[in-house]
Regions:
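A short, N-terminal "cap"/entry segment at the start of jelly-roll beta-barrel domains
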Residues: 1-34, 51, 128, 149, ...
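N-terminal regulatory/effector-sensing and dimerization cores
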Residues: 21-23, 30-125
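Residue-level marker of regulatory loop/turn positions in helix-turn-helix DNA-binding domains and
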Residues: 27, 52-53, 187, 191, ...
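Short, hydrophobic secondary-structure boundary micro-motifs
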Residues: 71, 96, 158, 181-185, ...
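An amphipathic alpha-helical interaction segment
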Residues: 108-109, 113-117, 121, 131-203, ...
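Basic/polar phosphate-binding segments, predominantly the helix-turn-helix DNA-binding elements
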Residues: 197, 201-247
Length: 250
């Protein structure tokens, strides 16, 4: 089967001209992290790259579906769905798509003063675990947004926007836990405040026969939602918690 570098149906591929990259590397505002090129290859069948001398940039590859592999320092690594890796600059490497389950990848070549530090922090194949707060869709949407901007032109403002924004994208890979919590910290704080209100209401009703229905009704929630939220935040069913409060009071 033929080996293909690019040209996949539905692909996106943008490479900045040499002079644009040089200008960015000499611009103190963005010089520490500069995008060379970015792209998206969906269902990249027969994708294969062999760089015997490496390349002049660092390379981030994020597999969002399917499977691929890469070889670095004589070791072969498998790259499953929702995993990413970074290849260092100037080092021989090969990478490609699985023959049986071709990968879908977002990728970016980048350079600058921070590039080596970023690469050193993100070695090997790194998972992006799925959970309710994974924000995988947010990261992909941001990749697509940067590709849109890359396609829109090479004026200074556009290039600066891409390079400054790329810092945020890299941060989402470097600090996955923080990236996830950033979006949900407000709702977490709101839930904590709600629990304090609920327990205060319980305290005021220790002499009464409070029911889950009455508790939920007081806050305008359904009984099932009230139960789930309270249990999630405290580890106790609401009425069991209320019973413990009564026992402690006695």
């Amino acid at each position: 089967m033929a080996k293909i570098k690019h040209g996949f149906s539905g692909q996106r591929l943008i490479v900045y001209p040499f002079y644009v990259i040089e200008q960015a590397l000499n611009n103190p505002l963005v010089a520490d992290l500069v995008v060379h090129s970015m792209g998206y290859f969906p269902k990249a069948e027969s994708h294969y790259i062999d760089r015997a001398s490496g390349c002049g940039e660092y390379l981030l590859i994020y597999c969002t579906k399917g499977e691929g592999w890469y070889v670095l320092d004589g070791k072969r690594y498998v790259v499953p769905e929702n995993h990413f890796f970074i290849l260092p600059a100037e080092k021989p490497h090969q990478y490609g798509s699985s023959e049986h389950d071709p990968w879908y990848i977002y990728w970016a070549h980048f350079k600058g003063k921070k590039a080596k530090y970023i690469s050193d922090q993100l070695q090997g194949v790194i998972p992006i675990d799925m959970d309710d707060n994974s924000r995988i869709g947010d990261r992909i949407a941001f990749f697509d947004e940067l590709l849109n901007v890359l396609e829109s032109g090479t004026d200074e403002a556009t290039v600066n926007y891409v390079n400054l924004s790329f810092n945020h994208l890299i941060a989402s890979f470097l600090y996955v836990k923080t990236y996830r919590e950033a979006k949900f910290s407000k709702s977490k704080a709101e839930n904590t405040f709600f629990i304090s209100l609920a327990t205060h209401f319980m305290t005021e009703n220790l002499e009464n026969k409070l029911t889950l229905k009455e508790l939920a009704s007081h806050f305008g929630y359904s009984e099932s939602y009230m139960y789930r939220l309270f249990f999630k935040e405290t580890g106790y069913a609401p009425m069991n918690y209320f019973l413990h409060m009564k026992i402690d009071r006695a």
